[in-house]
């Protein structure tokens, strides 16, 4: 599979996890999606953020993400 496909697939996993779980920490998203590489997860965040679908919040040094 090419990289763009992988990012798109992972973006779908992230969207589904956040749709079910609401606002989650990055650690919780990683666990829920089973995306192994952190870079792949952040690429998926970028995909969704570019589409205007994610909000980010820094809470006491920990990054949280949610669907908008």
Predicted regions and their residues:
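A generic secondary-structure micro-motif detector
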Residues: 4, 34-35
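Localized chelating/binding microdomains
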Residues: 14
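Short helix-capping/hinge SLiMs at alpha-helix to coil transitions
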Residues: 18-21
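Short acidic, hydrophobic short linear motifs in intrinsically disordered regions
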Residues: 23-33
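Short amphipathic alpha-helical interaction segments
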Residues: 35-47
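Glycine-centered, phosphate/nucleic-acid-interacting loop/turn motifs that mediate DNA/RNA or nucleotide
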Residues: 52
